[in-house]
Amino acid sequence: ALENVIEANTLLSGLGFENTGCAGAHGIHSGFSEIESAHAYLHGEKVAFGLLCQLVLENADKKLIDKIVRFLLAVDLPVCLADLNIEASEENLGIIADHTINHNPLIYNEPIVVNEVSVKNAILMADMIGRSYREGKYYL
């Protein structure tokens, strides 16, 4: 069994290298990293909430979003801006969206047209969804 895990890990590492498997979540993570109050959080924590933002940006199925939010909560990963110590101010959203769109090409791996407005809106909607789940008031 261990050999199978090692072999699968090696295979997936090679496949991941081919396209890095990176898109919106990593692009948005990069924007979060521009906010000083979020510097204490780990890469994976920022990508976790970035994934929720990506799903909103892609207009993903509500059942998938529900499943992801519940998983993130179960493993104590961020589901809203406050979980990353980021205030949802226009200034912060502008910094995040600008960096995501203009300084990190990963966002352009998304199969949709993205711009600063769509990124800001996705972050705000993901934040609202995450906060509602965290408060026990399910949005979906």
Task: Tell me what each language-model feature is.
Residues 60-140:
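C-terminal charged capping/lid subdomain of soluble metabolic enzymes
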Residues 1-74:
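Active-site segments that bind and position negatively charged phosphate/pyrophosphate groups
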